[in-house]
From Swiss-Prot:
Its EC number is 3.1.13.-. It comes from Azotobacter vinelandii. Trims short 3' overhangs of a variety of RNA species, leaving a one or two nucleotide 3' overhang. Responsible for the end-turnover of tRNA: specifically removes the terminal AMP residue from uncharged tRNA (tRNA-C-C-A). Also appears to be involved in tRNA biosynthesis. The active site is at H86 (proton donor/acceptor). The lineage of its organism: Bacteria, Pseudomonadati, Pseudomonadota, Gammaproteobacteria, Pseudomonadales. The record marks F29, F51 as: Important for substrate binding and specificity. Homodimer. Keywords: Exonuclease, Hydrolase, Nuclease, tRNA processing. This is Ribonuclease T. HAMAP family: RNase_T. GO terms for molecular function: 3'-5' exonuclease activity; nucleic acid binding; RNA nuclease activity. Residues 18-99 form the Exonuclease domain. PANTHER family: DNA POLYMERASE III SUBUNIT EPSILON, RIBONUCLEASE T. The keyword Nuclease applies. Coiled coil: none annotated.
Length: 116
């Protein structure tokens, strides 16, 4: 974790931020595991916010009416191979694609209101 966190802290600093926000599909589950590992390893400098995260299950439910990763990806026009599903790397890559797709199209889908 220390090695991974070094890279995350470097990216956070280079963007002028104070903390990273975890992105995950059912992210509260992942964040709980991350926080437990941090405590177990007695890591003092966790770059991730301790209780905030972006949950693609919730965001996809709002954006596409789908909370299952495979169905949300299909609704977003992202290829999803069911044979690859549930491998940590594949699901992580698809979650990242889904998150970026939702964020990049959120305004055109009516997710932001310009009050200016």
């Amino acid at each position: 974790l220390q090695e991974i966190f070094r890279g995350v802290r470097k990216a956070v600093k280079s963007h002028g931020c104070k903390r990273a926000i975890l992105v995950g599909h059912n992210s509260s589950f992942d964040l709980a595991f991350l926080n437990a590992a941090v405590a177990r390893c007695d890591i003092k400098r966790n770059p991730f916010h301790p209780f905030s995260s972006f949950d693609t299950a919730t965001l996809a439910g709002l954006a596409y009416g789908q909370t299952v990763l495979a169905k949300a990806c299909q609704s977003a026009g992202i290829e999803f191979d069911g044979r690859e599903a549930h491998s940590a790397r594949y699901d992580t890559e698809k979650t990242a694609e889904l998150f970026c797709g939702i964020v990049n199209r959120w305004k055109e889908m009516g997710g932001w209101v310009d009050f200016a």
